[in-house]
Amino acid sequence: MQNSHSGVNQLGGVFVNGRPLPDSTRQKIVELAHSGARPCDISRILQVSNGCVSKILGRYYETGSIRPRAIGGSKPRVATPEVVSKIAQYKRECPSIFAWEIRDRLLSEGVCTNDNIPSVSSINRVLRNLASEKQQMGADGMYDKLRMLNGQTGTWGTRPGWYPGTSVPGQPAQDGCPQQEGGGENTNSISSNGEDSDEAQMRLQLKRKLQRNRTSFTQEQIEALEKEFERTHYPDVFARERLAAKIDLPEARIQVWFSNRRAKWRREEKLRNQRRQASNTPSHIPISSSFSTSVYQPIPQPTTPGSMLGRTDTALTNTYSALPPMPSFTMANNLPMQPPVPSQTSSYSCMLPTSPSVNGRSYDTYTPPHMQTHMNSQPMGTSGTTSTGLISPGVSVPVQVPGSEPDMSQYWPRLQ
């Protein structure tokens, strides 16, 4: 085999194109399957494709044979006239029968064996051919009636007295009869040409009508089906047969109805979930309620130095007693909204450490030019440096100045 192989598969095994596996390999596949190996493991061990392993095992489980079937199109025809007639008989007895049920009946009644039983697809093909032949027979009958009517109209036109130049009905018209008959033949030949086009048009209309043949349910049938659907979405075969006997419908139609109804229910459930999610989701992003409302309130001038800080240190008294009165203003247009620091008790609470010792340190603050003359006459502390940060034009905030002691790392930002 290795001398005449024509290819190597994806697993590294050799094969001869168009030829079956040798019997030794087939026997090994069956033995490995009996020992409990999975098809994928057998495929890797023997270097045979997974599809080949599955096909051989499936045929072995079905027929008990590991021999290959016929090669190269020499497979005998399984849809013999006897089998086709049996299939047509089963279909007439039960129009809603499935192909696999026909296959089982062919086996159980001994019409076919496991070797020559037609496949489900072959049975479906036979059923399609039978349906098309039946439609063609019905169409031919309709066309025969149309031809009969057209032929009668052609002979009606040959009656004497209908056209000018014909003889009076009371007189014998032997000379005009051949001409009349010839004229009738001409009209028949002319009408036959139009008849072909009419037949083609009727055939198209009939085909469209047959293609759109759908089952229509009465109100009582729909109510019974909906009631059963409320009870269960997946009725078993006994429930379907009971319902079929109750509302006079084939069981197959009921099965198809339930399948379509489940699909409709899934679509409706999806729309309901989407609406529910849309109603639960707000249409806009709400502003966090953690912002303090005191941001928009004017800051009053403290009456006592250090009263806003809640402290009475002497250093703070000396530092802030020399400052001029600060006008009140609002922060609505000057400060950006920021979440409050967790350690703050309000938006502008004291940022000094809680240690009571200040060590007498004070901080210089930025002074606008128009207030410089007032500030020069007052004593100020000089033990620190400051820098300012602009929030908006005209408003300055002193930025934190690190000190030598860790307890003075923060202080209350005084606004000018």
Swiss-Prot record:
DNA-binding region positions on the chain: 4-130, 210-269
Spans annotated as Disordered: 164-201, 270-309
InterPro entries assigned to the protein according to its UniProt record, in alphabetical order: HD, Homeobox_CS, Homeodomain-like_sf, PAIRED_DNA-bd_dom, Paired_dom, PAX_fam, WH-like_DNA-bd_sf
Gene3D superfamilies: Homeodomain-like, Winged helix-like DNA-binding domain superfamily/Winged helix DNA-binding domain
UniProt-listed SUPFAM superfamilies: Homeodomain-like (SSF46689)
Chief place of localization: nucleus
GO CC aspect terms: nucleus
Biased composition (Low complexity): 281-294
CDD domains with a match to the protein in the record: homeodomain, PAX
Keywords: Developmental protein, DNA-binding, Homeobox, Nucleus, Paired box, Transcription, Transcription regulation
Subcellular location: Nucleus
A molecular-function term among this protein's GO annotations: RNA polymerase II cis-regulatory region sequence-specific DNA binding
Domain of life: Eukaryota
Residue ranges of the region described as PAI subdomain: 7-63
Pfam families the record matches: Homeodomain, PAX
Region (RED subdomain): 82-130
Family assignment from sequence similarity: Belongs to the paired homeobox family.
Protein task: May be a transcription factor with important functions in eye and nasal development.
Protein name: Paired box protein Pax-6
Originating species: Coturnix japonica (Japanese quail)
Upper classification of the organism: Eukaryota, Metazoa, Chordata, Craniata, Vertebrata
